[in-house]
Amino acid sequence: MKIFYLDTSSNYLYTAILEDTKVISEIKEKLDRDLSSLALFKIEEMFKNNNMNLNDIEKIIVVNGPGSFTGVRIGLTIAKTISWAKKIPIIQISSLEAMTLSSNNKYNYTVPAIDARRNYVFAAVYDNVNKNFILKEQYISINTLEAAMRNLGDDITYISNDKLNTKYSIQEYVPNISYIVENVMNREGINPHSVDANYLKMTEAEENL
């Protein structure tokens, strides 16, 4: 089964074409403000370079946030449009779950965190021993998050691509797309119109209404 994976929830483009869990081609590139203008071009180039087109794809896996509001919208728009036009099943996964799946789980706990500004993050705490989130995904202050982390001891890995105001050492997030796909590919696909952004927090404009 050929699978198209897409994550534009940060200032990076993470995308790949896979045959089941084997990566055929992938892009892991920091695009910053060029993400909106270059993402689709890079994706089209990836398909072209591998002599493939969207008709070859049988499943789409898209990251639906949290993260950059603009980035999340870009990825969901691309994935939903392809899914609808080509009638391809689509699976959504949160960015925090993708980060957790890509972590080095030799530690007891994994803490994926995404900068939400003003000393807040989108974060969760995953128990690698019992295989469950003990702190669900949420918008949380760094101080509150790290107070919870201190209660768990030192066997923790903190993952982020952002510069956070913390004394903890941070492991850079580099997605293991093959492993992410392996863990989610058998989930039931949904109608593209049912795919929702997982913002966890309203935009400032919405908060001020």
Where are these regions (language model features)?
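Oxyanion-binding and handling regions
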Residues: 1-22, 91-209
